[in-house]
């Protein structure tokens, strides 16, 4: 592992999930209006259909984690999303909506908006990454899988058995893997699993992922201060499988932490949270 490897830190701020879903619902509304005007080509119509299916699935999953009073339909979210667009496009805080207020600071020199200087969202107060403990939270009966002196086939089978017997709810999973006498990346995962009547188990939420190099130094950290919610059941297994595959490839060199972080984030469409430098390490 390169000595200049820096810790990859990713934070998802509170309210981000709702804001993203609502905004995408507003985009869907725009697509549908274009379709009504027969202004969409075939690729555009395909994107409309895929976005609608994705949003319907994501809203259904997200509503399960919300109190009944806060659950919203796709149509309700479309209306909020359109208002959000007005706020963003016209920089008008008076058009703001509850739960979505653009951050601004006084700056009389700004020509387009004499009272505001529009900036990126600041870090969530009290939730800076440096203030968050490094280790994932404690959970009852944590699962640790040690894969030493095992071939890839046996390692995969052991992981599958351990995960499939894990009870539903929050859990902590530690995976250690020795490959050709080199201790590979150590990954700690906090997540919430749902167990279905047919015995199928799916990852519904990923709360935290820490990755450490062979010296025990933290090199990648995914912190979900607002949970990253998996959009459909199949995603849960794909996310974990993408992790496990990195331990089962049998590389002689230690697995790269940044690559693992990219692999996990890509399942949520969050690759942009890694800088190019971090992604290349």
Swiss-Prot record:
GO CC aspect terms: host cell cytoplasm; host cell nucleus
InterPro entries in the record = NS1, uS15_NS1_RNA-bd_sf
Q: Which Pfam families match?
A: Flu_B_NS1
* Any GO MF annotation of the entry: RNA binding
Q: Which GO terms describe its biological process?
A: symbiont-mediated suppression of host ISG15-protein conjugation; symbiont-mediated suppression of host PKR/eIFalpha signaling; symbiont-mediated suppression of host type I interferon-mediated signaling pathway
Locate the region RNA-binding and homodimerization: 1-93
Coiled-coil ranges from the UniProt annotation:
none
Cite the entry's keywords alphabetically.
Host cytoplasm, Host nucleus, Host-virus interaction, Inhibition of host innate immune response by virus, Inhibition of host interferon signaling pathway by virus, Inhibition of host ISG15 by virus, Inhibition of host PKR by virus, Interferon antiviral system evasion, RNA-binding, Viral immunoevasion
Residue numbers covered by motif Nuclear localization signal: 50-55
Subcellular location as annotated: Host cytoplasm; Host nucleus
Return the annotated region ranges for G1P2-binding. 1-103
Q: Does the keyword RNA-binding apply?
A: yes
Q: Tell me the superkingdom of the source.
A: Viruses
- What is its quaternary makeup? Homodimer. Interacts with and inhibits human G1P2 conjugation by UBE1L.
Q: What does this protein's UniProt record list under function?
A: Binds and inhibits the conjugation of the ubiquitin-like G1P2/ISG15 protein to its target proteins. Since G1P2/ISG15 is an early antiviral protein, NS1 may inhibit the host antiviral response. Prevents EIF2AK2/PKR activation, either by binding double strand RNA or by interacting directly with EIF2AK2/PKR. Also binds poly(A) and U6 snRNA.
Family that this chain belongs to: Belongs to the influenza B viruses NS1 family.
Under the heading HAMAP family, the entry gives: INFV_NS1
Q: This protein is called what? A: Non-structural protein 1
Q: Which organism is this entry from?
A: Influenza B virus (strain B/RU/1969)
Taxonomy-wise, where does this protein's organism fall, top ranks first? Viruses, Riboviria, Orthornavirae, Negarnaviricota, Polyploviricotina
What gene does this protein come from? NS
């Amino acid at each position: 592992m390169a000595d200049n490897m820096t810790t990859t830190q990713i934070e998802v701020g509170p309210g981000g999930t709702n804001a993203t879903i609502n905004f995408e619902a507003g985009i869907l509304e725009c697509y549908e209006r274009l379709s009504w005007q027969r202004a969409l080509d075939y690729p555009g119509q395909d994107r409309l259909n895929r976005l609608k299916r994705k949003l319907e699935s994501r809203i259904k999953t997200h509503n399960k984690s919300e109190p009944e009073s806060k659950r919203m339909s796709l149509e309700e979210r479309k209306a909020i999303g359109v208002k959000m667009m007005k706020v963003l496009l016209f920089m008008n805080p008076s058009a703001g909506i509850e739960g979505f207020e653009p951050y601004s600071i006084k700056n009389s020199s700004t020509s387009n908006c004499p009272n505001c200087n529009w900036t990126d969202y600041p870090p969530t107060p009290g939730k800076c990454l440096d203030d968050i403990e490094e280790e994932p939270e404690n959970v009852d009966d944590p699962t640790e899988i040690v894969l030493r002196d095992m071939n890839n086939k046996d390692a995969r089978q052991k992981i599958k058995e351990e995960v499939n017997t894990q009870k539903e709810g929050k859990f902590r999973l530690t995976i250690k893997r020795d490959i050709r006498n080199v201790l590979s990346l150590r990954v700690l995962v906090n997540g919430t699993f749902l167990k279905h009547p047919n015995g199928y188990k799916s990852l519904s939420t990923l709360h935290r992922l820490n990755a450490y190099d062979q010296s025990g130094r933290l090199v990648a950290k995914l912190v979900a201060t607002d949970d990253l919610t998996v959009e459909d059941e199949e995603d849960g297994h794909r996310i974990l499988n993408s992790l496990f595959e990195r331990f089962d490839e049998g590389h002689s060199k230690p697995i790269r932490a940044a690559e693992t972080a990219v692999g996990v984030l890509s399942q949520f469409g969050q690759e942009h949270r890694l800088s190019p430098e971090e992604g290349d390490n």
